[in-house]
Amino acid sequence: MMKFYGQFDPPVDRFIFERYFPDLGTQGVFVECGAFDGQTECSCRFFEETMGWKGYNLEPVPWIYERLTQNRPMSSNLNVGLSDRTGTQRFQSVVHPVYGRDTTIGAVEHSPALKEYLIAQGCTFEEITINVLAWNDFIHRQKISRIDLMVLDVEGHEASVLDGMRDSDVLPSVMCVEVGHSGFGILRDILAEMGYEYDVSSNANAFFLRRDVLPLFAFRSAAQPKTAVALPIPDEIISRADLDELISERDQLLIRLG
């Protein structure tokens, strides 16, 4: 029986597997940015464990990175974050009254609303300095020439990471981007400029395909049994107008894919 680790229902990794890579024989390379400990709510462990994929896990918080290396010894694990530049960055680690420093909600900068909520829950903040890489420095240092899947969940820093990926010769075929903090519209526009088409949404994540690989995924889709289309992002995450536009773009893409 296959084991999935991702957040939500259906789990993120199961959703990605069934929609984009449903053949267990498909080989690939993934990048998970914001990997945490490599196990808790992990979106890519399934692909390494079950399908034998090569993986790169990026986690900038030192004490969490230590657990990542223990949980995922077969991956390439990096104690860095991605950004629009290479260097260092101030980072707000969250100390939870129950879970302590082991939380998934640290961020370069929390939104005022989220910070107010966390304080109300009894959380405190510990400022640390993390190392960050621009995308091109990351792929050149790791000698990466192909990426099939990237999962990007960095608590509101997504736009900066994407800005650092512009004009790169190596871009992921499939992008899974958490949109709840930065906003769907902003991220959709950046990715469109980078050569991506919006596909579908599931829970807090939006999925994008690189335009040049659309025929490949159309072929894979045609070979699989038809299933229900995933629900769009909930209303509380984006505006009704954005949601209507998102659904329209999804429908247009499905028409193009046949």
Language-model features, listed with the residues they occupy:
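Phosphate/nucleotide-binding beta-alpha loop and adjacent structural elements of enzyme active sites
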Residues: 1-258
